[in-house]
Design a protein with these regions (language model features):
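Acidic/histidine-rich catalytic cores of soluble enzymes
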Residues: 67, 125-238, 280
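A short, acidic, amphipathic alpha-helical segment used as a generic capping/interface helix at domain edges
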Residues: 236-250
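Alpha-helix N-cap and loop-to-helix initiation/capping positions
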Residues: 44-52, 80-88, 114-125, 148, ...
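Hydrophobic faces of well-ordered beta-strands that scaffold small-molecule active sites
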Residues: 3-7, 31-33, 64-69, 104-106, ...
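N-terminal pre-domain/capping segments
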Residues: 1-101, 135, 190, 246, ...
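Active-site acidic/histidine proton-transfer and metal-coordination neighborhood
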Residues: 13, 17, 21, 56-63, ...
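Active-site beta-loop-alpha junctions enriched in small/polar residues
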Residues: 6-10, 34-36, 69-72, 109-111, ...
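C-terminal/domain-terminus segments
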Residues: 253-278
Length: 283
């Protein structure tokens, strides 16, 4: 396995080039970069900029573990929004190819547990289209775990026509659904193509759809997500990392463990803590 870090974890708004340099200085193997908007989006990068970033990454000995193609909102739940979202996803897949990245990660919205729900077909049609294109380019579109349990996600992926996999975030399971990440790895194993290293605790159980609707639109007035879960430094929350890493190894996973730290007073210190914790377990 290899260890990576999301560039935005060094500070939202920090130039991507600076974050790449920080990642190299801390001894990471690769970086995951947000590519939907901002300076690393398809709209922002011309051929010369792509060449410049490739040269920087090569000079620092870094790979691009994945691009993040998350577009926010309700993901692929709204049919009339999907043509534009599919087009953007395909452009991000093309951008991933420019950097030799084999994975594009994204949140897709809340997958209904009932396959007869009309939203299920809307999402399936969109992800099938995205998956076909990604597969044609040698890339996997990796759905980030979050609002649904592993069995629902597994069934959904099985219903696509390839090119769709999993970006497994263990903290999202423990914080939102309450599912043990180890059991999720055992079920999703063959579909896992990228992972996040993140820890957290659930403070109060609720319907995950309520949480993700809040993320998408601002949700229910006065809803405070901090009442329901909390992201914490790796090793201090409810993710059993020794068991989780062991499960990944047993499943044959040999890809990236990419650190994601979205909060905290000193994110870089937490990034180093996560790196050191994972190194002891993965190697």
């Amino acid at each position: 396995m290899k260890i990576g870090v999301i560039t935005d974890c060094f500070g939202f708004g920090l130039p991507v080039a600076t974050a790449i340099e920080r990642a190299a200085a801390l001894g990471f193997d690769g970086v995951q970069i947000y590519a939907t908007t901002g300076s690393f989006s398809p709209d922002a990068l011309d051929a010369e900029a792509i060449k410049s970033y490739r040269e920087l990454l090569n000079s620092k000995g870094l790979e691009v573990s994945a691009l993040c193609g998350d577009m926010g909102g309700h993901g692929f739940q709204i049919a009339e929004d999907n043509p534009a979202r599919i087009e953007m996803t395909n452009r991000i897949v093309d951008l991933a190819c420019e950097f030799g990245a084999k994975v594009v990660t994204t949140h897709i919205g809340v997958i209904p547990s009932d396959k007869n729900d009309p939203t299920y077909k809307v999402m399936l049609d969109a992800l099938t289209a995205c998956g076909k294109y990604a597969k044609s380019r040698g890339v996997t579109l990796a759905i980030e775990t979050g609002p649904e349990t592993a069995d629902v996600l597994y069934g959904f992926i099985q219903d696509t026509e390839g090119g769709v996999g999993v970006n497994l975030d263990p903290a999202n399971f423990v914080m939102v659904t309450g599912q043990d990440p180890v059991s999720a790895v055992k079920l999703l194993g063959k579909h896992i193509v990228h992972t996040h290293v993140k820890d957290g605790v659930m403070l109060k159980r609720t319907d995950p759809k309520i949480i993700y609707d809040h993320f998408a639109t601002g949700g229910i007035e006065a809803l405070n997500v901090a009442d329901f879960f909390k992201e914490v430094p790796v090793g201090t929350g409810d993710v059993d990392f020794p068991a989780y890493i062991a499960a990944l190894k047993e499943a044959g996973y040999d890809g990236y463990l990419t650190i994601e730290r979205e909060t905290g007073a000193d994110p870089e210190a937490d990034i180093v803590l996560a790196r050191d914790t994972i190194k002891k377990l993965a190697f």
